[in-house]
């Protein structure tokens, strides 16, 4: 028998050295069960115990150092005795006890370190080395892992993305240089997923919400009362709402799209997890949701006498949630960790979100219409937002996203947005000028937020100044606009002069391209501060001295290419080529030898070096002081900057919609108010198109279709085979409705749109395994929700009902639902169905009309035209569709035979119209 070989050091079956080939016995194949049992007995396998990370650390520590004594208490901050710890570790444990649920990064020299359990955890999360540190004679080694201080933000971003909160303990003073002298350290930052403000931790075009939920203590679904408040700390936006019933709360929670959700107890968290186990909640038991505490916190934070002025009167649940949110933010706010700091998280007055002033789009409808992400892959590309977003700023992109979440009901507000788009469409020059202004505009909302929190860099302030300097040119553009405009345009017409003065102040004090590291200096202009100018003059003198010293040493040594250079570790030194070593004078002191270079120092250079360092240090400190004062000035203008930024964001969103209109031939729709009893007109669209599908069909022409809910015919029965375009058509109507109510133009040749108070969809269904509901039960639950909540002003889009049960049960349910919608609710409805029998409803109800997807049949081949025409289809074409899918011919023939038999026995005696 020949033997197979395992060839080492080579993955491609050719050994580098035949002696390195290790021979093994050929592996037997096709063993029976008995053979496998014998094999198991011949070579029994040993059970391996699971090894957690702490045990692995112990094992590695012992193997690396045989003399280490393992002490169980040294692996957890909870069990270690603080009396036995070194002063530094005692301080670490004290801080960790105050932040049990957060990772603590503790500054030691050039690293931020973690110890005990945190070290083991971050070594795994960040894939960094787990090592050890001596914590005292009686404790011995403890786990340690750390990251370089200059890379701390990048590593924190990774931890935040994994939904961890981080506490930063930094050095509050520089080392004195005396070994053994303790350095003052303290918490300078608490970073949680919902409170990050750093640019690298945020998604530029998306809000980063933190939410707090107050939940009443009730026992039944419908009796639960709740309040939700959510804030974007980076932009200052604050929204609050309240409601009743757990089912509505669960839907709102999914729509929150929050990075962090705060609740006040484990009981509340456990109850909310039942609604959606995929969402993580932060339990903050020290956060108070009491009504009295909330009243005090809100009035104190916003500096108001009562809650009526901000719309919270009699909204106790919303008030409680807002109080809880402010309480939580107060506890983790960096400014509260530094009592002398005047900086804080700055939030706008709360926007009260009522159900009666916005188009309500529940989570299921958002998902079915693929408003912000695709349904199957959860991708941005292929969503409605993707198809219309042509914004130039991050502020504008976030604004457009918010508009899509909450479209308008007020036709006057919609008209005003349309008027901005009309102005842009009527003047290409106006459009291009605005594009050029906004193209390089910084994110003023978040830049101001960083300044307010004390984290803005010099480059952030420069970006703020550059943005504010564009305000006069934006004003001149707005003044050219015609028609009735939104209120926010007044801010751009009447610019706060203080903002322009602020921009000038920043430009006067900061250089155009300041360094990234603010401790290096070089960020403040000359002529800003007399003391700084004096220090810089001295530095220039010493620089001139160094040049003269370099010339002098060249003459003494006769080395023409000699240079005096600087190294951050060695200071100033004389550098010469190694070939010139024999020319080095005796007063030179050798400092370092490199491959092609020799480095020396002299007593004169060393003497001057100390003085240069002192002056540089004083100059850098002075620059930092001037910069911090400037940053505080900017922080005081945070609300004004953010307010003007929101106006710019709205302008950008509408500019983007105008560009979308130009690119895709959108038109301005006419509007019918929601409570207009003077007209019987309803939604009518000529040559409407699906904005998403049309853009995805790059090589094909989209087939446009008409739709009309006229003459009180509120319900449309839409029939046609699979893949013919029914789902695309009903989604198309929903998308056009949303576009209309955000103020956009729409993809059609002509459109008259009745404003809707809510959009309901029931499109497709799958098992809900988490709640144990079958496909049919999910479908029926969604249908029940629509029938119980829809009003005559709603838009209902149904794609199949009754598929998960028997044919006659399903048909009966679909029939009854259709009649209920047409007769009782009387809202605009499209019902796409395979039950062509539903076409007969038109004969019994004047509120119902039939439409079908036109299909041509040629020699048993289906040809889809994707055209929607009046009249019902008398065939479902299911067998033909099965044939197209590749079902065997024998099955197809049998299906035809069965169908003929069923149709003869169950034929309804009506003519389809």
UniProtKB/Swiss-Prot annotation:
<dbReference type="Pfam" id="PF05190">
    <property type="entry name" value="MutS_IV"/>
</dbReference>
<dbReference type="Pfam" id="PF01624">
    <property type="entry name" value="MutS_I"/>
</dbReference>
<dbReference type="GO" id="GO:0006298">
    <property type="term" value="P:mismatch repair"/>
</dbReference>
<feature type="binding site">
    <location>
        <begin position="720"/>
        <end position="727"/>
    </location>
    <ligand>
        <name>ATP</name>
    </ligand>
</feature>
<keyword id="KW-0227">DNA damage</keyword>
<keyword id="KW-0067">ATP-binding</keyword>
<keyword id="KW-0234">DNA repair</keyword>
<protein>
    <recommendedName>
        <fullName>DNA mismatch repair protein MutS</fullName>
    </recommendedName>
</protein>
<dbReference type="Pfam" id="PF00488">
    <property type="entry name" value="MutS_V"/>
</dbReference>
<dbReference type="InterPro" id="IPR000432">
    <property type="entry name" value="DNA_mismatch_repair_MutS_C"/>
</dbReference>
<dbReference type="InterPro" id="IPR007860">
    <property type="entry name" value="DNA_mmatch_repair_MutS_con_dom"/>
</dbReference>
<keyword id="KW-0238">DNA-binding</keyword>
<dbReference type="GO" id="GO:0003684">
    <property type="term" value="F:damaged DNA binding"/>
</dbReference>
<dbReference type="InterPro" id="IPR007695">
    <property type="entry name" value="DNA_mismatch_repair_MutS-lik_N"/>
</dbReference>
<dbReference type="InterPro" id="IPR017261">
    <property type="entry name" value="DNA_mismatch_repair_MutS/MSH"/>
</dbReference>
<comment type="similarity">
    <text>Belongs to the DNA mismatch repair MutS family.</text>
</comment>
<dbReference type="Pfam" id="PF05192">
    <property type="entry name" value="MutS_III"/>
</dbReference>
<dbReference type="InterPro" id="IPR036678">
    <property type="entry name" value="MutS_con_dom_sf"/>
</dbReference>
<dbReference type="GO" id="GO:0005524">
    <property type="term" value="F:ATP binding"/>
</dbReference>
<dbReference type="InterPro" id="IPR005748">
    <property type="entry name" value="DNA_mismatch_repair_MutS"/>
</dbReference>
<dbReference type="InterPro" id="IPR007696">
    <property type="entry name" value="DNA_mismatch_repair_MutS_core"/>
</dbReference>
<dbReference type="InterPro" id="IPR027417">
    <property type="entry name" value="P-loop_NTPase"/>
</dbReference>
<comment type="function">
    <text>This protein is involved in the repair of mismatches in DNA. It is possible that it carries out the mismatch recognition step. This protein has a weak ATPase activity.</text>
</comment>
<dbReference type="GO" id="GO:0005829">
    <property type="term" value="C:cytosol"/>
</dbReference>
<keyword id="KW-0547">Nucleotide-binding</keyword>
<dbReference type="GO" id="GO:0140664">
    <property type="term" value="F:ATP-dependent DNA damage sensor activity"/>
</dbReference>
<dbReference type="InterPro" id="IPR036187">
    <property type="entry name" value="DNA_mismatch_repair_MutS_sf"/>
</dbReference>
<dbReference type="GO" id="GO:0030983">
    <property type="term" value="F:mismatched DNA binding"/>
</dbReference>
<dbReference type="InterPro" id="IPR007861">
    <property type="entry name" value="DNA_mismatch_repair_MutS_clamp"/>
</dbReference>
<dbReference type="InterPro" id="IPR016151">
    <property type="entry name" value="DNA_mismatch_repair_MutS_N"/>
</dbReference>
<dbReference type="InterPro" id="IPR045076">
    <property type="entry name" value="MutS"/>
</dbReference>
<dbReference type="Pfam" id="PF05188">
    <property type="entry name" value="MutS_II"/>
</dbReference>
């Amino acid at each position: 028998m020949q033997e197979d070989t395992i060839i080492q050091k080579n993955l491609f079956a050719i050994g580098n050295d035949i002696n390195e080939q290790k021979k093994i016995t050929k592996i037997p194949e096709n063993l029976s069960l008995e053979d496998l049992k014998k094999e198991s007995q011949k070579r029994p396998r040993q059970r391996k115990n699971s090894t957690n990370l702490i045990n692995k650390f112990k094992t590695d520590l012992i193997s690396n150092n045989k003399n280490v004594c393992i002490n169980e208490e040294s692996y957890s901050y909870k069990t270690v005795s603080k009396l036995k710890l070194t002063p530094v570790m005692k301080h670490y444990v004290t801080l960790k006890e105050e932040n049990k649920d957060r990772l603590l990064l503790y500054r030691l020299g050039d690293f931020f370190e973690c110890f005990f359990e945190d070290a083991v955890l971050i070594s795994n999360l960040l894939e960094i080395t787990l090592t050890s540190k001596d914590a005292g004679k009686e404790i011995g080694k403890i786990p340690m892992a750390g990251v370089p201080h200059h890379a701390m933000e990048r590593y924190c971003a990774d931890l935040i993305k994994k939904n961890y909160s981080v506490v930063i303990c930094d050095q509050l003073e520089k080392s004195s240089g005396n070994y053994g002298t303790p350095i003052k350290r303290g918490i300078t930052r608490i970073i949680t997923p919902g409170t990050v403000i750093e640019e690298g931790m945020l998604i530029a075009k998306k809000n980063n919400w933190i939410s707090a939920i107050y939940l009443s203590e009730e026992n039944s679904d419908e009796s639960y009362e709740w309040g939700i408040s959510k804030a974007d700390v980076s932009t200052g936006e604050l929204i609050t709402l309240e409601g009743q019933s757990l089912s509505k709360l669960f839907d709102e929670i999914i729509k929150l799209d929050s990075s962090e959700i705060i609740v006040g107890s484990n009981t509340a968290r456990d109850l909310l997890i039942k609604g959606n186990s995929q969402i993580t909640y932060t339990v903050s038991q020290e956060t108070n949701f009491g009504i009295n505490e909330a009243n005090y916190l809100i009035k104190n934070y916003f500096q108001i006498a009562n809650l009526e002025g901000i719309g919270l009167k009699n909204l106790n649940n919303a008030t409680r949630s807002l109080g809880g949110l402010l309480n939580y933010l107060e506890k983790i706010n960096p400014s509260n960790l530094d009592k002398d700091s005047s900086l804080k998280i700055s939030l706008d007055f709360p926007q009260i979100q009522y159900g009666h002033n916005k188009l309500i789009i529940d989570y299921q409808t958002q998902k079915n219409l693929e408003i912000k992400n695709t349904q199957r892959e959860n991708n941005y590309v292929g969503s409605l937002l993707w198809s219309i977003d042509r914004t130039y700023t991050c502020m504008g992109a976030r604004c457009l996203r918010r508009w899509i979440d909450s479209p308008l009901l007020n036709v006057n507000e919609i008209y005003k947005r349309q008027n901005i788009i009309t102005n842009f469409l009527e003047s290409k020059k106006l459009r291009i000028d605005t594009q050029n202004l906004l193209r390089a505009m910084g994110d003023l909302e978040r830049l101001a937020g960083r300044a307010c929190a004390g984290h803005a860099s010099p480059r952030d302030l420069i970006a703020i100044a550059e943005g504010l300097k564009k305000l006069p040119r934006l004003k001149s553009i707005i003044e050219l606009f015609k028609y009735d405009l939104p209120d926010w345009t007044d801010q751009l017409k009447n610019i706060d002069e203080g903002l322009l003065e602020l921009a000038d102040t920043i430009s006067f004090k900061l250089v155009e391209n300041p360094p990234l590291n603010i401790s290096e200096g070089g960020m403040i202009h000359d002529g800003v501060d007399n003391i700084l100018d004096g220090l810089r003059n001295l530095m220039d003198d010493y620089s001139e001295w160094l040049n003269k010293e370099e010339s002098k040493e060249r003459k003494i040594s006769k080395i023409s290419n000699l240079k005096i250079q600087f190294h951050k570790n060695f200071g100033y030194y004389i550098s010469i080529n190694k070939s010139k070593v024999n020319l080095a004078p005796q007063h030179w002191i050798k400092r370092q030898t490199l491959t092609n270079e020799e480095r020396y120092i002299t007593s004169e250079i060393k003497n001057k070096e100390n003085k240069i360092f002192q002056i540089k240090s004083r100059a850098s400190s002075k620059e930092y002081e001037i910069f911090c004062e400037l940053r505080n000035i900017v922080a005081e203008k945070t609300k004004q900057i953010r307010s003007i930024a929101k106006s710019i964001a709205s302008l950008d969103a509408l500019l983007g919609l105008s560009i979308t209109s130009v690119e895709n031939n959108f038109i301005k729709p006419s509007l019918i108010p929601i409570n207009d009893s003077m007209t019987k007109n309803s939604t009518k669209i000529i040559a409407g198109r699906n904005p998403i599908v049309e853009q995805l069909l790059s090589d094909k022409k989209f087939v446009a279709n008409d739709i009309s809910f006229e003459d009180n015919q509120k319900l449309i029965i839409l029939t046609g085979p699979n893949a013919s375009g029914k789902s695309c058509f009903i989604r198309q109507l929903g998308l056009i409705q949303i576009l209309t109510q955000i103020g956009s133009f729409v993809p059609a040749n002509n459109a008259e749109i009745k404003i809707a108070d809510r959009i309901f969809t029931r499109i497709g269904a799958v098992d809900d395994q988490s709640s144990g509901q079958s496909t049919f039960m999910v479908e029926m639950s969604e249908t029940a929700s629509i029938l119980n909540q829809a009003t005559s002003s709603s838009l209902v889009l149904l794609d199949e009902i009754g598929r998960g049960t028997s044919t006659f049960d399903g048909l009966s349910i679909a029939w009854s639902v259709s009649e209920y919608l047409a007769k009782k609710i009387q809202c605009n409805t499209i019902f796409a169905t395979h039950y062509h029998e539903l076409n007969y409803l038109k004969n019994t109800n004047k509120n119902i009309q039939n439409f079908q997807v036109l299909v041509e049949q040629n020699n048993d081949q289906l040809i889809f035209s994707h055209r929607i025409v009046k009249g019902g289809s008398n065939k479902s074409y299911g067998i033909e569709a099965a044939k197209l899918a590749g079902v065997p011919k024998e099955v197809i023939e049998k299906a035809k035979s069965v169908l003929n038999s069923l149709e003869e026995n169950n034929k309804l005696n009506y003519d389809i119209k």
